Amino acid sequence: TTGWAYYDESKEDAWNRSVEMMRKVCDYAKANDILVAIEALQPNESVLANSVEQLKAYLDAVNHPQLKVCIDFGAMARVNNTIQDYFDAFGKDVIHTHFVDGKPTGHLAWSDGTRDLKQDLLDLEANGYDGYLSLESVNSRYYEKPWEAEEKTLSAFDQLETK
């Protein structure tokens, strides 16, 4: 992620520090033949990149071929961005997805939120996405029984196959 600003630090200083550090991370990644995927965060998680527009500005500032994009469905929904917004801005640089349900946010298991699972999959497919879908169900409701989130998500996928 882009990180956060220190409480006594300007957003500009935090941005510059983050960009400089991300270039170092990407240089290391290049030397080891790996890619780095970065996500926008929700406004309560970071002050640096919360939207497609801000994430695009960040990637432009870092300007490194190893830096790619992860769509986080929670952050995306929080600022009313769409899957299509991400592909319009980043195209094939979208290499990973935190594929979760939400109301509109919440990092919920599929079927616990209000997102349209089938339509989201169709939108990814329409854009030629062939990357991974990480199930990032990190809501406190799953802390005691985390497997329930996976079971709900698998059930939601199974229901798609029977329709």
What are these regions (language model features)?
Residues 49-70, 77-163:
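Histidine-acidic metal/acid-base catalytic patches
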Residues 1-69, 78:
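Active-site acidic/histidine proton-transfer and metal-coordination neighborhood
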Residues 39-41, 74, 138:
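Short loop/turn motifs enriched for small/polar and acidic residues
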